[in-house]
């Protein structure tokens, strides 16, 4: 898949990667209990919403045919075609989760994956008025890249290396001067929007580098606080970042609200994204909106995605 990143549909050499994506999804379907509907995200190879185009590799119609199950897929194209960013798409699921937890006040849900995403939810309101979403900035991606290059480890286990170092506050402050952080929400990034961030910490020790890259993730979340319509009393953390003890410690120290590992309230922080696309699939099947002006900057609520029958 690394060899086809950045390619658009007409590019040569996509067939082996498409076949691999189909095969692994068919394998997963075979291992799971039989369902009535599959939400199939595909693999994003290229994303250029400024020019109204996005490309997720994977043929949902072929998956439906071979799996014998209806498939909702191609969730982003319609949003991008109508002037939206095509991301993030999980916020409507976050709204449903807040309703499920019977929240009677606004809450922020932050997913710390390669990039950080924040959804502000007021579940007392309909999604057209009770949602705001944006990408906060880099999260695990630069730290993981640094760890792999420097130590051979895929990530900073428990945040141990970062916890042993000192944050270079000047590096953090300089990074936050980038124009992205002064833009209004909604706004989105991809994993490589800020380029190779290793150069920011090239003069620091390994421990100080890890501490500083962790602090950048936290500072980006803090920088997003003024964008929320009402400051929530809780922030639920999902994604791999919640397993980084130092990252969670820094969030708790620097945020004015209670920071909660989403697992601690009975939700599954590892499966949230997969669950979100199952939920999106159900909405597509019913013709319900999957994105909104305050989540992707689309001009009106719309139902993205295609539905393919077996």
Predicted regions and their residues:
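Short glycine-rich, Thr/Ser-proximal phosphate-binding strand/loop in the N-terminal lobe
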Residues: 1-12, 128-131
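Short beta-strand-loop/turn "lid" adjacent to the catalytic site in phosphate-handling enzymes
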Residues: 8-60
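Phosphate/ATP-binding catalytic cores across multiple sugar-kinase/actin-like superfamilies
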Residues: 24-32, 206-231
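Short helix-loop-beta connector
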Residues: 34, 103-105, 229-233
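Phosphate-binding/catalytic loop of phosphoryl-transfer enzymes
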Residues: 49-54, 65, 69-153, 303
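Conserved ATP-utilizing enzyme core subdomain
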Residues: 126-218, 296, 300-310
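Glycine-rich phosphate-binding/hydrolytic loop that grips phosphoryl groups
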Residues: 215, 263-310
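Glycine-rich phosphate-binding loops at beta-strand->alpha-helix junctions
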Residues: 232-252
